[in-house]
Design a protein with these regions (language model features):
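Short secondary-structure boundary/capping segments
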Residues: 123-128, 192, 201-203
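Short aromatic-cysteine micro-motif
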Residues: 50-180, 184, 209, 225
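Charged, compositionally biased non-catalytic regions
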Residues: 1-20
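C-terminal, surface-exposed recognition/capping segments
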Residues: 1-2, 144-158, 162-164, 171, ...
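Flexible loop/turn segments at secondary-structure boundaries
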Residues: 117, 192-196
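Extracellular adhesion/carbohydrate-recognition regions
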Residues: 19-105, 195-258, 267
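Polar/charged alpha-helical tracts
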Residues: 9, 94-95, 279, 283
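A short linear-motif detector with a strong N-terminal bias
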Residues: 9-14, 41-48, 155-157, 164-165
Length: 307
């Protein structure tokens, strides 16, 4: 057996095949969770039977995608998903993307489409993950805590990856994705705001990694019309986030809040501009809640409408 064959066999057996070990192009391991293909209607009642965007890469429908089980560490400018490590932190988007893509073909920074699918799956299945969002503990379940890996102002800051209880995993089981709630800030690829206009890399093409041009001037970025169709950025009537009456508002009109500062609020409290109906794509990419005023476990959205 190879250096990591026994590790891979053990990880697979202990998780019932739901976790896998994947090697990068220099033979170093990371542990991933396999996320099987799902439909929009399986996430939100009343939506279409279309397969979620996370499973469409370069016009090819995928049976699954693989998501890091653990928040990554960085070794020699490469990102690795391993348990009981102090996760990488204070890293910008470009460096995070590069660390993922440095591992070779197929490896990429987690995308907004993938993140959205997992979040919607958790809500549908009643397993919104708890986590280190209050100095090593969960703010709502204060008896739950992870193992400290760093201090912050004399209190627990970060926790070792995967050191919390199973409720800190996306499915509330040991074979799930750890630490999606809190611990460190995480970057996603494939979605950006430009002066409030929501722009995306279509489907899950951001998962193409280094083969996908996500530079500021890339022509791959598309805006979203009110009917859900994709158009060139700057087209009239595209979806935007505005800040209205102390809440994030989804609008297709002109932005009214033009202060260069971060604002945000509870995801459930987002509002719609008068006359606008949120298209399915907005709900599937977490641009607008599928159930306004519903229970999203206190999740927040933050944004800056300028720049």
């Amino acid at each position: 057996m190879g250096n990591y064959d026994q590790m891979a066999a053990a990880v697979s057996e202990l998780s019932g095949g739901k976790n896998v070990v994947l090697l990068d192009d220099i033979g170093m391991p990371s542990i991933y969770v396999r996320i099987p293909k799902g439909k929009n209607s399986e996430l939100v009642s009343g939506l279409s039977d279309n397969v979620h965007y996370a499973f469409n890469v370069d016009s090819v429908e995928k049976t699954a995608f693989y998501y890091s089980k653990y928040q990554n560490i960085i070794v020699n400018e490469r990102a690795y998903s391993l348990g009981h490590r102090d996760p990488a932190n204070s890293i910008n988007w470009d460096a995070a993307r590069k660390a993922c893509e440095n591992k070779g073909a197929g490896f990429h920074l987690a995308t907004m489409a993938e993140w959205a699918y997992i979040a919607l799956w958790c809500r549908k299945n009643g397993t919104m993950p708890h986590g280190n969002n209050n100095y090593g503990k969960d703010s709502a379940y204060t008896h739950e805590h992870g193992e400290e890996s760093s201090k912050d102002s004399g209190k627990t800051g970060r926790c070792f990856t995967g050191s919390g209880p199973v409720t800190w995993n996306h499915n509330h089981h040991g074979d799930g994705i750890c630490d999606l709630n809190g611990n460190v800030w995480e970057w996603n690829a494939g979605m950006r705001l430009v002066d409030g206009e929501i722009q995306i890399i279509p489907y899950n093409n951001a998962a193409m990694g280094s083969k996908c041009d996500m530079s500021a001037s890339s022509t791959l970025w598309k805006a979203i019309k009110a009917d859900g169709s994709l158009v060139e950025p700057g087209t009239a009537g595209t979806l935007k986030w505005d800040w209205v009456s102390g809440k994030i508002q989804l609008t297709s009109g002109a932005i009214t809040y033009k202060t260069d500062s971060g604002v945000g609020g509870l995801y459930k409290d987002m509002t719609l501009a008068s006359g606008l109906t949120a298209p399915e794509i907005a709900k599937m990419l977490l641009l607008y809640p599928d159930e306004p005023n519903g229970d999203y476990a206190g999740d927040y959205h933050w944004f800056n409408p300028v720049g």
